[in-house]
Amino acid sequence: MPRGNIRHVLSAQGVLCSNQIKGGSTMQLSPYLFFNEGLCREAMTTYAEILAGELGMIVEAADMPPEFPIDEDKKGWLAHCEVNFPNGKLMGSDSLAGPSEPMAGANVMVNFESREAAESAFNRLLEGGEATMPFAPTFWSAGFGMLADRYGVRWMIGCDEAP
């Protein structure tokens, strides 16, 4: 299955890439996702597979220091997880303190070099989810679509190919 290279990932929290900023420093803004019902491990593994990333740091709730007590039924949940990409990372955790409300107005944007790779990622993320804008050509791109995946994360998937 063609996957293409991820050019950049955007979210309300920032851009998933390294940028040089004034003064010569570099920065990296990374979306951080919260999952209810202990679904972080499953979701992040799915995203790593679909978006051709690699699972990085994983911290289980059971490994938290004693000053951070965790309910017994949540010890298998994740306190932190990372999916690494060449230019950044996607991070997440389970909502250990209680249910997390979805962010209003926030989406994770992934832009691929090719329409084929973008459409493939869109269709795989859509499994068990709901399309809010079907993947199709637009006036700015050969392919773009929006969806909420089965974990409740809202995605915008596009490509660099001209319409």
Q: What is each model feature region?
A:
Residues 5-11, 15-25, 29, 35, ...:
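Vicinal oxygen chelate
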Residues 43-51:
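Amphipathic alpha-helical segments
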Residues 104:
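Acidic/polar active-site rim loop that often engages polyanionic ligands
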Residues 57-76:
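N-terminal G-site of the GST-like fold
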Residues 36-41:
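Short acidic-aromatic low-complexity motifs
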